[in-house]
Amino acid sequence: MPLLDSFTVDHTRMNAPAVRVAKHMSTPKGDAITVFDLRFCAPNKDILSERGIHTLEHLFAGFMRDHLNGSDVEIIDISPMGCRTGFYMSLIGEPSERQVADAWLASMEDVLKVVEQSEIPELNEYQCGTYEMHSLEQAQDIARNIIAAGVSVNRNDDLKLSDEILGQL
C-alpha cells in the first residue's frame, strides 16, 4: 500500500493550533488544488470532543467559506480527521497559510456568535447522519481555545520523517 503524504510528517513535532499545507496538486486543466491540515490539537496529547467536532463540522464549513472564498479561492470540502485532532480542507487555489489562519480565527469568532443549538445548519435527521450528536457549548469551548492560543504554521520540511525512521516503522 502506498504511504500517504499525511503519514510522512512527524506527528510528535506538530504544533497546534496550526495550519499546514498537506498537499499541492493540479487538475488536468491546470487548476491548483491545495489541501490544508488545520490542526486544532497536538496529536496524541489532546482530542476534540465527539459532539464538539461534529458541531464544528457543520458550522466551520460555512464560516470558512465566508472568510476565504473569493475570485481565486474556492473551498471544495472541510472534513474532520478521524483522529479528531483537526480538519482537512481541500480547495481550488493557493492561499497563504496566513490567509487560512486568519479565516480560521474569524470563523472561530463566528462560532462564538451562534446563540442557540437550533442555529446549527443541517441539524435534522434528513441532512445529518447523527443529528442528535451535537454540542454548541463544546464547539464554542473549542473556538475559545483556538482564539486564545492563536494559529501558527507547521511546515512540512520541519516535520518530515527521515527515510531511516520511515524504514523502521
Swiss-Prot record:
What's this protein's family per the entry? Answer: Belongs to the LuxS family.
EC number, UniProt record: 4.4.1.21
On subunit structure and binding partners, the annotation says: Homodimer.
NCBIfam families on file: PRK02260.1-2 (NF002602)
Q: Would you tell me the protein name for this molecule?
A: S-ribosylhomocysteine lyase
Matching entries from Gene3D superfamilies are given as: S-ribosylhomocysteinase (LuxS)
Oxidoreductase keyword on record: no
The UniProt record gives the binding positions of Fe cation as H54, H58, C128
Q: How is the cofactor bound?
A: Binds 1 Fe cation per subunit.
Biological process terms from the Gene Ontology for this record are:
quorum sensing
> Which Gene Ontology molecular function entries are recorded, alphabetically?
iron ion binding; S-ribosylhomocysteine lyase activity
Q: Does the keyword Lyase apply?
A: yes
Q: Which reaction does it catalyse?
A: S-(5-deoxy-D-ribos-5-yl)-L-homocysteine = (S)-4,5-dihydroxypentane-2,3-dione + L-homocysteine
Could you tell me what this protein does? Involved in the synthesis of autoinducer 2 (AI-2) which is secreted by bacteria and is used to communicate both the cell density and the metabolic potential of the environment. The regulation of gene expression in response to changes in cell density is called quorum sensing. Catalyzes the transformation of S-ribosylhomocysteine (RHC) to homocysteine (HC) and 4,5-dihydroxy-2,3-pentadione (DPD).
- Known InterPro entries for this protein? LuxS_sf (IPR037005), Metalloenz_LuxS/M16 (IPR011249), S-ribosylhomocysteinase (IPR003815)
Taxonomy, top ranks, is: Bacteria, Pseudomonadati, Pseudomonadota, Gammaproteobacteria, Alteromonadales
Gene behind this protein:
luxS
Keywords in alphabetical order, please.
Autoinducer synthesis, Iron, Lyase, Metal-binding, Quorum sensing
Needed co-factor(s): Fe cation
